[in-house]
Amino acid sequence: MKCPSCQSEVSAADKHCPNCGAQLGGENGAPEAMKAVTSTGLVLGKKAREARIKEVVDPSAIISDRAYNGTIAIVLLWGILINYLLCRFVGTAIFTINPIVLLVGYVVLAIVGIVMVAKSQNPGISFLGYNLVVIPFGLVITYMVEHYGGIGSEVVTNAFLYTLLIAVGMMACVMIAPNFFSKLGGALGAVLIGLILCEVVLMILGVRQIVTDWIAAGLFALYIGYDIYRSQQFPKTLKNAVASALDIYLDIANLFIRLLEILGHKD
């Protein structure tokens, strides 16, 4: 058998790779748990999105459409860059962190970050909250990336390319059929909650989650389109631009993780 991180030959009795130190035991458990936990970020942000629609905004805080959408793009790319740098420089060292500690740290920081983004009217505080979500999520992504061979592996490269193509495709779909995405909110939320509960049960039972990965990938693809559409319905302020970037980031990051699992299982 081969190490999922460095692809070197290892013995079935090895608990850690002799070459890179990657954890070999419990190979499926940690990624399955990470998928279910990271999906909860979208649930946590649901009420915040609803509040932003109804929010009364000081007219002086409104910025132009170009500045608003430009801020969303810059903040989103910042999050993706942070994730890339974590994958690049943390690498296999991520396996020295207990997966449970990693997940608990993500949940705690993500809750704090999402609350900061939702409650603060200061764009700087909102951006700090954004980073409190992006950095621990980036460490989770690093774990998943190294689990499937690192940045240079075929699985990771293909997952990134497919994620990029789907994100661009969903953006185009929003421009073509915005009314379709305007009706998806309640249905997407219900399916997501059901999916998380289903995955938790399957994880406890030790069932390999291939079908749910495909369902989740489709769900997060639709979420990308939905959150891009919703971003244009909020009052156009710097604070809402950061919050919208967080929504879209979570969609894209979760889609990437699911595609990693799909392509990894395929191999």
Name every feature range the model reports, one short phrase each:
Residues 2-267:
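A hydrophobic alpha-helical transmembrane-helix feature that marks the membrane cores
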